[in-house]
Swiss-Prot record:
It comes from Populus jackii. Belongs to the thioredoxin family. Plant H-type subfamily. It holds the Pfam family Thioredoxin. It is found in: Cytoplasm. Its main location: cytoplasm. SUPFAM superfamilies: Thioredoxin-like (SSF52833). It comes from the Eukaryota. CDD domains: TRX_family (cd02947). Keywords: Cytoplasm, Disulfide bond, Electron transport, Redox-active center, Transport. Disulfide bonds join 58-61. Residues 20-132 form the Thioredoxin domain. The record marks 59-60 as: Contributes to redox potential value. This is Thioredoxin H-type.
Length: 139
């Protein structure tokens, strides 16, 4: 498992595209309004949200991104979001992000689980456990 400790300053060469963090059915969150919109949409549709607080400069974030995208395609009943902690630093701080990647599982906007670090088996295990806890009509 890997993780990066959160940092407040980023270097000028951090201006890489978001391509490595989002894709597939992963929604890139760039504003608080977009976050609110996606959480509303998920609540309306009865979906669990998996929010990945990530950073472009974080090696483990880059390593798990393709797997996260793959999960988004394999589990369409979940809503997958990615938030760049540098772009939305105040918002990320409100979630007390200490390391990246940090994954939050939310139902109706409330946290139901959390995972810190790029641990593929544990991420998959948590997704499976959450899906198994849902009534059959919500899966």
């Amino acid at each position: 498992m890997g993780l990066c400790l959160a940092k407040r300053n980023h270097d000028a060469d951090d201006d890489e595209p978001h391509i490595e963090l989002a894709g597939g059915n992963v929604h890139l969150i760039t504003t608080k309004e977009r976050w609110d919109q996606k959480l509303s949409e998920a609540s309306r549709d009865g979906k669990i949200v998996l929010a990945n607080f990530s950073a472009r400069w974080c090696g483990p974030c880059k390593q798990i991104a393709p797997y996260y995208i793959e999960l988004s395609e394999n589990y369409p009943s979940l809503m997958f979001l990615v938030i760049d902690v540098d772009e939305l630093s105040d918002f990320s701080a409100s979630w007390e992000i200490k390391a990246t990647p940090t994954f939050f599982f939310l139902r109706d906007g409330q946290q139901v689980d959390k995972l810190v670090g790029a641990n593929k088996p544990e991420l998959h295990k948590k997704i499976t456990a959450i899906l198994d806890s849902l009534p059959p009509s919500d899966k």
